[in-house]
Amino acid sequence: MLFRSLNLPPYPFRLTKKEEQHYIFDEIRKKHLVLTPEEWVRQHFIQYLVLEKKVPKSLIQIEGGLLLNSLQKRTDLVVYNRQGKRIMIIECKAPSIKISQGVFDQAARYNSVHQVKWLVVTNGLQHCYALISHQESSFKFWEELPDYENL
């Protein structure tokens, strides 16, 4: 196997190799992407959201842009509710990147723009789910991410 097993269910990805470069088919964007460790995590987490947590594919945005302190940044994944409001930001890291305070702070900075109620950080091995209360300026970590209808 090209990349290590993750702490997510295995999925039957469409992998290809062309000129020594591996690619993975992105089911949402309908195109082949260069297979990097971070992309491996992102594609697993997308499938986890769709198949396990019942998030509609049409309500997931991949690599959405945002402006933060006059700098153009990208969120890995954004989930929307059925009314088109952002409800979750997911920051994906390669399995070799430890989920640290710095990684969580990066996602929190992105959330200062989006103001979502769920903040998720994952490296495919460890997943941190935080429910944000913007009114109280606080958050609470959850062991498990609720199904889409309960977000």
What are these regions (language model features)?
Residues 3-118, 125-151:
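A short, conserved, highly charged catalytic patch centered on acidic carboxylates
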